[in-house]
Regions:
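Primarily recognizes the serine-hydrolase "nucleophile elbow" in alpha/beta-hydrolase
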Residues: 130-172
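Catalytic His-Asp charge-relay segment
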Residues: 174-180
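Serine-hydrolase catalytic machinery in alpha/beta-hydrolase-like enzymes
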Residues: 30, 37-50, 55-124
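Stable alpha-helical elements in mature extracytoplasmic
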Residues: 73, 77, 109-116, 142, ...
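C-terminal catalytic histidine-bearing segment of alpha/beta-hydrolase fold enzymes
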Residues: 179, 185-232
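Solvent-exposed loop/turn segments at secondary-structure junctions
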Residues: 66-70, 94-97, 137-140, 163-166, ...
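A domain-start/cap signature at the N-terminus of enzymes
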Residues: 2-59, 105-108, 138, 194-198, ...
């Protein structure tokens, strides 16, 4: 199976994940919880916002970490998750270096994200029409690449300082938020976002783009703007 066929099948599978009745969901409390799906050192976390109740459906943001990191490193989103009211799912890449498509091609990470989504649906009341896929650095590259191929599942894509864009297929038409520091030495803006954004707009995507004074790090003001863009 080539990567196009794999991702097309994955998009269909993600879109078809079952809806879990409220009575079937396990109890979950606000705060950070381990996923307990993967190996001890490569698993991930789910963050439940303050005030969470299963009586209503909540937006979901799947946030992907950068190279050599884990899902715990997306904790910069947790305070805003409390403020705006969103569940954060942060899986670990299967390889400790980075996400699969940046190494060999789509495969184990897509499968694990799918399993983590199913696990989250089992635990939380998620509003399926308000789901975003996002990340920073390599996580941004992966969310941008995978998000274009799973737009029927993720209606919004958030990419903080992406370095590559490698979609294997196109499904749906997600709205896209991209930001990049103009002095980024890791993923220089002139060969990344300044090329990606015009290309995406020419393909008909609704793209919000922000450049800011800074390097490769995530800035709080831009993260807040992304939350507002997605949730308000």
């Amino acid at each position: 199976m080539n990567r196009r066929e794999f991702l097309a099948g994955t998009a269909t599978a993600l879109a078809g994940l079952p809806t879990i009745a409220r009575a079937q969901r396990s109890e979950v409390s606000p705060g950070q919880h381990d996923l307990k799906l993967g190996e001890a050192d490569r698993d991930g976390v789910i963050y439940i916002p303050r005030g969470y109740t299963p009586d209503k459906a909540w937006p979901l943001m799947v946030m992907l970490h950068g190279a050599g990191s884990t899902g715990r490193n997306v904790s910069y989103t947790f305070q805003l998750a409390d403020e705006f009211g969103a569940v954060i799912l942060a899986p670990d890449s299967r390889h400790e270096a980075t996400w699969d498509v940046l190494l060999t091609g789509y495969g184990p990470d897509v499968e694990f994200i799918g399993a983590a989504l199913k696990h989250t649906y089992n635990r939380c009341n998620i509003e399926r029409k308000r789901m975003a896929l996002g990340g920073h650095s390599d996580g941004a590259s992966y969310s941008l690449s995978l998000g274009i191929g799973t737009g029927e599942t993720f209606g919004h894509v958030i990419a903080f300082s992406p370095g590559v864009m490698k979609p294997a297929e196109v499904h749906g038409k997600p709205r896209i938020f991209i930001s990049h520091g103009i002095s980024d030495p890791i993923m220089p803006i002139d060969v990344t976002s300044r090329r990606f954004v015009p290309r995406l707009k020419n393909l008909g995507y609704d793209v919000t783009y922000r450049e800011y004074e800074g390097r490769h790090g995530v800035t709080p003001a831009v993260v807040r703007e992304a939350f507002e863009w997605f949730l308000r």
